[in-house]
């Protein structure tokens, strides 16, 4: 378990967001960025380059390797990246046939939550180099947005938790 890792444990993650959150929760750990696909990162773990690593459960599931996970972290403890797990499809604006086909694939609640999370990301001028997390969820006619922005070293993490009308979710 994360809480039981000894001081100085070398932890690898591919995410600046996860690194900042982890350092904020456990500044006694040695957290570093690890590059490569899931197999490469597992190889680095097996080779002793790291004592532990963070991996997306979806990636482990795709590879049939869920069994290597020793702990599944909750979004309450580690908020995901904005729009993480959502798939977006684009096409030419004047291609009415394709637009009609794609409209059947649109999931309005997912689109609404993604747009809310991305609005927060835009308001914070976020990029892949900024430790920002966001998770929007719909409850009836309301949307709740939990978010955070952190210093890269984890020394400071600012949280927000707001609820409002879905119609206002992008403002």
Which positions does each model-derived feature cover?
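A conserved helix-loop-strand patch within extracytoplasmic ligand-binding domains
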Residues: 1-29
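Small-molecule-sensing regulatory modules
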Residues: 24-171
